[in-house]
């Protein structure tokens, strides 16, 4: 796929342009310079043609604790991109940072560079004073306002017009899309860099280095995956700034865009209430979740350590009893392959389709062996069960009246279905519906999800 990188100094509107092009608010946008630190990837479609857009951190001559790493990330983006959008701001004018970015880009004579002048709001284009911008050495800029969508169509036409120069690369089908979530500094970015085999994300001992949710595609054993790394979720009392609040929202959005979750824990410290809260997001999302215990190389171990830690996890995450638990060290590159082995196991279980006759045999047998308790004045009677379409295994059980269902019996049936059909690593959902129209009007269907049930 054609790759286009957005490059420029801080606060020229790179992230606003990125969000405008992908028609979604993924990159954090704020008036504070330097908000974007990592590369952020998104897909753009224009006139039935697609390309990948890369947002980058701002280039500046000023010293910053992260500036050297940010510049490294920008360099990675330039290296992998086919086209560079060099963005300047008409509102702020040019300064030493613009010249610094221009000097860096001029070193890449093999790259196609489109000079873009942003933040042209309501000015008449014919009255613009562009003389100072010619000093950057890239000719006349394309005039846009990313915030107000002015000139965006012309910019997209220019990019698509260059697409044929770079050939058409066949797009490989994704095996899985998953996000990595966890509290700050558990090693999410270190794992992502291990998966990608390069320093794609800033890694630091300072908690909260990653602010955006960062999409990346990579190949493992010749199969294509998409991973979404996220900012660490802090305790509510520590979400002090707008930027941190945006990061929490990005994490929630990353989960909504994923098909699977890697919940990362720090194995070198005790589990915290914060870990439990983040685990609750996995439960609410109702997505397959792999609990990944990181930094296992730092733990003093004997033959019982792993099992004891698993028991602690099961005690803290009672609402995720089906989630597999694996132990890795992202920094030391230990047992990373177990992530993909587990993903493949989960994918296989998600694809299981059960014949209606076999499913009814299992449910009716379970029903006969263990009769439902009397609840709300009567006993539940199940007459028919079928598998419904869904992202996770979903089953509809027709009964005399869902009001007679006790949650313990729903859990019993869930466990029987899991045992019979090998659904040990995925969430499943049971819908209890009345078999006749009259009861359907008088009662509510019951949705049983994992370890509890909600009235629909």
UniProtKB/Swiss-Prot annotation:
Coiled coil: none
Cross-referenced InterPro entries: G_ENGA (IPR031166), GTP-bd (IPR006073), GTPase_Der (IPR016484), KH_dom-like (IPR032859), KH_dom-like_a/b (IPR015946), P-loop_NTPase (IPR027417), Small_GTP-bd (IPR005225)
Stated role: GTPase that plays an essential role in the late steps of ribosome biogenesis.
PANTHER family: GTPASE DER (PTHR43834:SF6)
Record carries keyword Cytoplasm: no
Protein species of origin: Mycoplasmoides gallisepticum (strain R(low / passage 15 / clone 2)) (Mycoplasma gallisepticum)
Record domain KH-like: where: 352-436
Protein name per Swiss-Prot or TrEMBL: GTPase Der
Any one Pfam family match given in the protein's UniProt record, by short name: KH_dom-like
Ligand binding (GTP 2): 182-189, 229-233, 294-297
Keywords: GTP-binding, Nucleotide-binding, Repeat, Ribosome biogenesis
Subunit description: Associates with the 50S ribosomal subunit.
Key word Nucleotide-binding present: yes
A GO MF label: ribosome binding
Residue positions binding GTP 1: 8-15, 55-59, 118-121
Domain EngA-type G: 2-167, 176-351
SUPFAM superfamilies on file: P-loop containing nucleoside triphosphate hydrolases
